[in-house]
Design a protein with these regions (language model features):
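Exposed, low-structure sequence patches enriched in small/polar residues
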Residues: 1-169
């Protein structure tokens, strides 16, 4: 892969991250599930640090993957947008939310793509969110709370919530 960062003004920057990949996956249990995938993923973002301890990231995500699965060829393309915002809560914590919307198309009418294709985004339109709250209550106690949602062809309105409390001795 390759990553380029261009600082723009004092409080913002552009970042372009391109990853090239080539996978060959075999299954010992089901040999017909052998799949070969090659392609690239591009993540182009603009980050700005605002006053009042807020960071905002806006970006364009895209990728192309070609290969074969079940003996059939596929050619998948995806393009979308993403945003990420971080609120710093004094010196004690932060709230971070990322939202990604992408549309994936495939030229050979594959109904379901392998999970390695296009960073795991499903065929069609996908909306994913990830929110995380991290907060240090005092010097010996903190908590983390994660909320994830996925709405796509595979997972209709899926919501996961995970939390933890940590004690430091």
């Amino acid at each position: 892969g390759m990553e380029n960062i261009l600082k723009f003004l004092d409080n913002s920057s552009f970042k372009n991250n391109i990853n090239f990949h080539d996978y060959s996956i075999d299954s010992k249990v089901y040999p017909e599930r052998k799949r070969d995938i090659f392609g690239f993923w591009n993540d182009f973002t603009w980050q700005i640090k605002l006053k009042y301890k807020i960071d905002v990231v806006l970006g364009l995500i895209s990728g192309v993957d070609k290969g074969s699965v079940y003996g059939k060829s596929f050619n998948a393309k995806g393009i979308g947008i993403k945003s990420n915002i971080i609120f710093y809560l004094k010196q004690n914590g932060r709230l971070q939310t990322e939202v990604a919307f992408i549309n994936v198309v495939e030229e050979n009418n594959f109904g379901i793509l392998p999970p390695e294709v296009l960073k795991g985004y499903a065929y069609g339109q996908s909306l994913k969110t990830n929110s995380r709250l991290q907060y240090l209550l005092n010097q010996s106690l903190s908590f983390n709370l994660n909320l994830n949602t996925i709405n796509d062809m595979r997972y209709k309105n899926m919501i996961t919530l995970q939390g933890e409390v940590r004690a430091y001795f």
